[in-house]
Amino acid sequence: MPDGIDFKDLHRRFDGAIAAFKHDIASLRTGRASANLLDPIHVDAYGASMPVNQVATVSVPEPRMISVSVWDQSLVGAVDRAIREANLGFNPIVEGSTLRIPLPELNEERRKELVKIAHQYAEHARVAARHVRRDGMEHLKKAEKDGEISQDEARVQSDRVQKMTDETIAAIDKLLAEKEVEILQV
């Protein structure tokens, strides 16, 4: 193929937008416990802000319970404080160096808030995909202007970039719909 776009790089960047969205929505709380729920929480430990999973083992022993086994006994208070201050509605129970976090039932208002947040995450992912498309299209226009590719080849590659964008946005929308059903399920 003549010069134009590196479609492997474009594909990698589109996949990155989807992966980032998956990571974002994984941290949204549904009715079930998940170790990912604590991903956004950082603990002040050893003079730095660290994710909970770097100072403790996070597990899910029961469907509505998260267990956090802190490795360093002196950090139990800091982990407890970080979880309480994260405003996720968690109330840890300290048992030695382990924190047990029962997940309360989600009320309808909180479920709707979580759906709104999921929609915001999806919009950020769509915008990221559109930025990738814009970069690709600008590269094509420059290549065509510089005479590296023909007008026909630019049109073909442009259509391919648009198709990749549409597929990425469709994948994001599908993931959003699945997460929405999961959140609203009582």
Swiss-Prot record:
NCBIfam families: frr. Keywords: Cytoplasm, Protein biosynthesis. The keyword Cytoplasm applies. Signal peptide: none annotated. This is Ribosome-recycling factor. It comes from the Bacteria. GO terms for cellular component: cytosol. Belongs to the RRF family. CDD domains: RRF. Responsible for the release of ribosomes from messenger RNA at the termination of protein biosynthesis. May increase the efficiency of translation by recycling ribosomes from one round of translation to another. One of its GO terms (molecular function) is ribosomal large subunit binding. Its main location: cytoplasm. Gene3D superfamilies: 3.30.1360.40, Ribosome-recycling factor (1.10.132.20). Pfam families: RRF (PF01765). InterPro entries: Ribosome_recyc_fac, Ribosome_recyc_fac_dom, RRF_sf.
